[in-house]
């Protein structure tokens, strides 16, 4: 049945399958409030108006999902010119850009952020495939090779993993990792290319489950060859604003993915917290399971895919609908675009990691 939804996120209140017009008002809101005419994604937090490679990478993905080729091209052009020294084939993007001490605008930290590089490579490869654009395909392939050379390390006793960046995460036989930097869908897509990707994809369930012994993902975790998983000294065992993406990625896994059932079951305790308290926690100890605070609405959106078909889905949809999108909450808006966009049926990932966007005039909300 077709429901007419007058408010921006009123669709979220519909607990029955409903036909939703595939115009994406949340994406329009994001473009209006966060993307400059030049193609820069601006995070207004604390008045700094910074740009991160993360923001650029996510916006590229959302532009692809919405078949927005003009915005995709602007985002890519700005990313390459300002973050990659004008050449994405030769340099990984710098992760942080903003106002420098001398008042000029430019790169603030030249280190890379591998999760952003993953999403940029993925979006380029899928844009090339879906739009039949050979330039995007070639650029995505070259970027993926550079990621393999500069950001992948083979950890003794574990195997090849993605380091959070090209520098600063390895020392004295110990490596710091971020589980949320490893969307299984992306590794599945990359597995068809030459490199360590197939082995990394096979290793991922072990990495995610062992680093979250109680079913709560940590933001950061260390691997030490002779001791295994260890708490990251300067960050602790807390899972919060980074770790929320682990549940998001797992919820969006294809039903045909052989690892989906065990991963969803392992990380079910986060949804149990919603059932017990009526809200998601802001932070959780990955070792003790102790919870702190009340998570923002972006967390609710991020858990929508994982809650599919469960009573929690209705609660989460209402929380997202009641809050809507803010004009000054970049990260929460990103989580909402990912989670609510998936919940609205605007895109899916196939078992091989390929993107399945709904570019028809209407899409199916589930």
Give the predicted meaning of each segment.
Residues 1-4:
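Positively charged n-region of N-terminal signal peptides that target proteins for export
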Residues 19-54, 64-107, 156-161, 195-232, ...:
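Low-complexity, Ser/Thr/Pro/Gly-enriched N-terminal "stalk/linker" regions
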Residues 21-23, 49-53, 92, 115, ...:
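Extended ligand-binding clefts on enzyme/binding-domain cores
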Residues 60-65, 119-129, 185-189, 248-252, ...:
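Short glycine/serine- and small hydrophobic-enriched flexible loop segments
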Residues 281-366:
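C-terminal functional modules
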């Amino acid at each position: 049945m077709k429901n007419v939804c007058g408010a921006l996120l009123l669709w979220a209140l519909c607990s029955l399958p409903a036909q939703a017009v595939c115009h994406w008002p949340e994406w329009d809101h994001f473009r209006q409030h966060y993307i400059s005419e030049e193609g820069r994604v601006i995070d207004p937090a604390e008045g700094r108006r910074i740009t991160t490679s993360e923001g650029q990478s996510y916006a590229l993905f959302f532009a692809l999902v919405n078949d927005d080729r003009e915005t995709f091209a602007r985002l890519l052009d700005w990313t390459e010119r300002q973050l990659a020294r004008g050449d994405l084939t030769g340099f990984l993007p710098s992760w942080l850009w903003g106002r420098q001490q001398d008042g000029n605008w430019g790169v603030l930290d030249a280190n890379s952020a591998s999760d952003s590089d993953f999403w940029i490579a993925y979006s380029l490869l899928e844009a090339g495939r879906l739009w039949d654009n050979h330039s995007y395909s070639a650029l995505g392939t070259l970027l993926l090779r550079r990621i393999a050379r500069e950001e992948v390390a083979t950890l003794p006793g574990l195997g090849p993993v993605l380091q959070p960046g090209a520098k600063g995460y390895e020392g004295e036989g110990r490596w710091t990792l971020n589980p949320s930097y490893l969307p299984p869908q992306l590794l599945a897509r990359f597995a068809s290319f030459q490199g360590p990707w197939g082995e990394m994809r096979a290793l991922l369930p072990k990495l995610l489950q062992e680093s979250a012994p109680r079913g709560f993902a940590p933001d950061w975790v260390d691997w030490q060859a002779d001791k295994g998983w260890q708490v990251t000294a300067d960050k602790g065992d807390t899972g919060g604003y980074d770790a929320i993406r682990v549940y998001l990625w797992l919820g969006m896994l294809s039903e045909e993915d052989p690892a989906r059932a065990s991963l969803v079951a392992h990380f079910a305790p986060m949804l149990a917290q919603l059932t017990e308290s009526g809200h998601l926690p802001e932070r959780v100890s990955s070792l003790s399971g102790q919870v702190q605070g009340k998570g923002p609405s972006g967390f609710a959106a991020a858990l929508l895919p994982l809650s599919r078909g469960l009573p929690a889905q209705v609660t989460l949809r209402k929380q997202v609908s009641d809050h809507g999108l803010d004009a000054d909450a970049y990260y929460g808006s990103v989580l909402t675009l990912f989670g609510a966009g998936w919940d609205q049926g605007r895109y899916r990932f196939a078992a091989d990691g390929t993107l399945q966007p709904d570019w028809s005039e209407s899409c199916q909300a589930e």
